[in-house]
């Protein structure tokens, strides 16, 4: 076993990587509130796992979406638990993200030289809100349908470009299959990919610059 480890160590310098991860200096003023960002990440990972599990049963069509969600909740093995955890962790992710933003702002974590870390965090906050908007519509029940209709209708108040924006969001002049398809694609592919990219940037900058000092 040691020979196998030595082989990998010679090529990848595993020990140096492990030392860098485990020996990072943690300032003495750090408390439990500095864990809010990590909790938000944990919620996101739970979202990915449970969301992926539901894609095996969910059908993104206006005629089958609601019935497929009912199937997940009533017939699929542990489907009710997986969807419930998905919903609870979604609410928890939003709450932890908001508290994390407040913590960073109140402790001055956005100041020089951490401006870019703050910017990526703001982008992540917008992406988190977008998850909520797109995911809310996927069951395609009365609440989801009218929520989509209202949200996608908001840009219509913008002069000149309002109507084209509404049609871009909906995929057509009215809410229908094109809208559900777009929201499903955003929720399951585009937003998770963007979130993963910006989270990686966020964490790399934190690793590089360290945790901000006390006020």
From Swiss-Prot:
The keyword Plastid applies. Heme b 2 binds at residues 86, 187. Heme b 1 binds at residues 100, 202. It is found in: Plastid, Chloroplast thylakoid membrane. The chain crosses the membrane at residues 32-52, 90-110, 116-136, 186-206. The keyword Iron applies. Keywords: Chloroplast, Electron transport, Heme, Iron, Membrane, Metal-binding, Photosynthesis, Plastid, Thylakoid, Transmembrane, Transmembrane helix, Transport. One of its GO terms (molecular function) is metal ion binding. Binds 2 heme b groups non-covalently with two histidine residues as axial ligands. Heme c binds at residue 35. It is a multi-pass membrane protein. Its cofactor is heme b; heme c. Its main location: plastid. GO terms for biological process: photosynthesis; respiratory electron transport chain. Heme 1 (or BH or b566) is high-potential and absorbs at about 566 nm, and heme 2 (or BL or b562) is low-potential and absorbs at about 562 nm. Component of the cytochrome b6-f complex, which mediates electron transfer between photosystem II (PSII) and photosystem I (PSI), cyclic electron flow around PSI, and state transitions. Belongs to the cytochrome b family. PetB subfamily. The 4 large subunits of the cytochrome b6-f complex are cytochrome b6, subunit IV (17 kDa polypeptide, PetD), cytochrome f and the Rieske protein, while the 4 small subunits are PetG, PetL, PetM and PetN. The complex functions as a dimer. This is Cytochrome b6. It comes from Oryza sativa subsp. japonica (Rice). The gene is petB.
